[in-house]
Amino acid sequence: MSESLRIIFAGTPDFAARHLDALLSSGHNVVGVFTQPDRPAGRGKKLMPSPVKVLAEEKGLPVFQPVSLRPQENQQLVADLQADVMVVVAYGLILPKAVLEMPRLGCINVHGSLLPRWRGAAPIQRSLWAGDAETGVTIMQMDVGLDTGDMLYKLSCPITAEDTSGTLYDKLAELGPQGLITTLKQLADGTAKPEVQDETLVTYAEKLSKEEARIDWSLSAAQLERCIRAFNPWPMSWLEIEGQPVKVWKASVIDTATNAAPGTILEANKQGIQVATGDGILNLLSLQPAGKKAMSAQDLLNSRREWFVPGNRLV
């Protein structure tokens, strides 16, 4: 194989842990792992380690959990490891310029989109919501900007009509490690060919919010159906009925024109709950009332038919 590189890995969630696992199987030398501090989780708010920390400790790797990499003493932790390259995957902390320049080959990042499209925090969800035909991963050389560095390697995959953010996440978690290992080989061999991003093609993937996931019936049925898939499994699209939030897990588009005001319930039967939108009809198929499990529209109608009387409007 190519030269074995001394690698610092920086990442936090499961998506990152899958990349670390691939690195550990690749023959490279992971000399240290940076991940975010343990966070309170669950009902008991017990401090929980990140998936990356769990894997790193299982493999006996040195783990560092600074709150920030701005203090000089924390930057020294990076310098002391004398790495050839730092691999960053969904780490969640900003790397100052001094840290970016410490490894011999700099720092590289695995980003969940085909840059320069969808720079930012939520590329998977934004690509789905926008109706993109494909997405993928980009391995890039990091600089001080937000996902602005030169691109080293790309892998793409189609977005299907059934994909959710959850299924795309899994697809990219398979693609990312493949691209990462190939990029590291090219860096070690000196065959990498950095490509400058075309600034005229840039779009931004802003962070998601729960309020943004509230269904806006003035949008088209096609947009709302994509939104429901984009926000699954988090934060989940939702609507409000009698002051209660009801999550929507699945819906379909009925390509029929209607003059009814957006949000008007047109039909409620075993085929679903059909609601007028700004353009077309959205058929709600799977919903989850507060405190309940997700259920089919038919099961919800059996217990809450009064919520979905044809002619009433959802707001």
Curated annotation (Swiss-Prot):
Annotated Pfam families: Formyl_trans_C, Formyl_trans_N
Q: Note the InterPro entries from the entry.
A: Fmt (IPR005794), Formyl_trans_C (IPR005793), Formyl_trans_C_sf (IPR037022), Formyl_transf_N (IPR002376), Formyl_transf_N_sf (IPR036477), Formyl_transferase-like_C_sf (IPR011034), GART_AS (IPR001555), Met-tRNA-FMT_C (IPR044135)
Entry's Gene Ontology molecular function annotations: methionyl-tRNA formyltransferase activity
| Superkingdom field | Bacteria
| Annotated residues for binding of (6S)-5,6,7,8-tetrahydrofolate | S113, L114, L115, P116
Its keywords, alphabetically, are:
Protein biosynthesis, Transferase
Provide the Gene Ontology terms for cellular component.
cytosol
EC number of this enzyme: 2.1.2.9
**What does this protein's UniProt record list under function?**
Attaches a formyl group to the free amino group of methionyl-tRNA(fMet). The formyl group appears to play a dual role in the initiator identity of N-formylmethionyl-tRNA by promoting its recognition by IF2 and preventing the misappropriation of this tRNA by the elongation apparatus.
Family, per the entry? Answer: Belongs to the Fmt family.
* PANTHER family xrefs: METHIONYL-TRNA FORMYLTRANSFERASE, METHIONYL-TRNA FORMYLTRANSFERASE, MITOCHONDRIAL
Q: What is the name of the protein in this document?
A: Methionyl-tRNA formyltransferase
Source species of the chain: Escherichia coli (strain 55989 / EAEC)
